[in-house]
A protein has these predicted regions:
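Single-stranded RNA-binding regions, centering on S1/OB-family and related RNA-binding modules
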Residues: 1-205
Length: 205
C-alpha cells in the first residue's frame, strides 16, 4: 500500500518550545518533532489496533545526507541509511551524483522492527518502491535485438551498460574494453523478468 498522508504536505520540522515576543524569536526543537512523528506513525494505533506504517508499505521520505556509498533519508522521524545497491537497479558508483539533500523519494519499507519502542529499526529501498515500473521498462528489451547504451561500470564479472534506465551485464568484448561513459552497441542475450536482469554482448564499442 502507498502511504499518501496529508502530513507530507505540511511537515513539522520543529516543535515550538517558546516564543520571545519582544525579540520576535521562536525557540523550536527538531528532536521533539521527530519524536512526535515516530510516535504517530510507528507506535500509535487506530481503533482496530493497526499501525499507520507496516513492512511492505511505500511512503515518501526526505533525503537528509548523501555520501558516495548511499543516502540517509528521514521517514516520519527516523533517519535511515540506504546503501547504493538499494537506490537503483542501475549500477551506480556514487550516490552524490544522483541525489541531493532535500530531495523527496519514494521508499519501500522492507523491514520494520518496533519491539524496542526507543530504538525502532527500518530497512528501506528506493529501487524496490519502483519495481513495477522497472519491470515494465525491462520487458521492452527483446532477446536477440540490438540496442545502444552507455557504459556505467566495469567489474570483474563484466561491463554494465545502461539504456533507458535499465542496466545490462555484458561479457567483456574481444576488442579493447570501452571506457566508462562511452556509447556501445549491445545484443541482448537473455532476460530474467523475475530477477529483473538483462545480460548481453557488446558487438561494437
Amino acid at each position: 500500500a502507498i502511504k499518501a498522508h496529508g502530513v507530507m504536505q505540511k511537515d513539522i520540522d520543529y516543535v515550538v518550545k517558546g516564543i520571545e515576543t519582544d525579540a520576535g524569536v521562536a525557540a523550536g526543537s527538531r528532536l521533539e518533532a521527530m519524536r512526535q512523528r515516530r510516535r504517530e506513525y510507528y507506535l500509535d494505533t487506530d481503533r482496530n489496533g493497526h499501525h499507520q506504517l507496516e513492512a511492505g508499505d511505500i511512503a515518501e521520505a526526505r533525503v537528509v545526507s548523501v555520501i558516495r556509498p548511499g543516502a540517509f533519508v528521514e521517514l516520519f522521524g527516523i533517519e535511515q541509511f540506504i546503501p547504493l545497491e538499494e537506490l537503483s537497479y542501475l549500477r551506480w558508483v556514487d550516490a552524490t551524483t544522483h541525489f541531493r539533500v532535500g530531495d523527496r523519494v519514494l521508499v519501500k519499507i522492507l523491514e520494520l522492527d518496533r519491539s524496542d519502542r526507543n530504538n525502532i529499526s527500518l530497512k528501506l529501498s528506493v529501487k524496490q518502491a519502483g519495481e513495477d515500473a522497472f519491470k515494465q521498462a525491462i520487458s521492452r528489451f527483446k532477446v536477440g535485438n540490438i540496442y545502444v547504451g552507455n557504459v556505467t561500470m566495469i567489474t570483474a564479472v563484466g561491463v554494465f551498460v545502461s539504456f533507458e534506465n535499465v542496466s545490462c551485464l555484458c561479457q567483456f568484448p574481444k576488442r579493447k574494453r570501452p571506457a566508462i561513459g562511452s556509447p556501445v552497441t549491445v545484443r541482448i542475450l537473455g532476460a530474467d523478468l523475475e530477477r529483473l536482469r538483462l545480460w548481453g554482448a557488446i558487438v561494437y564499442s
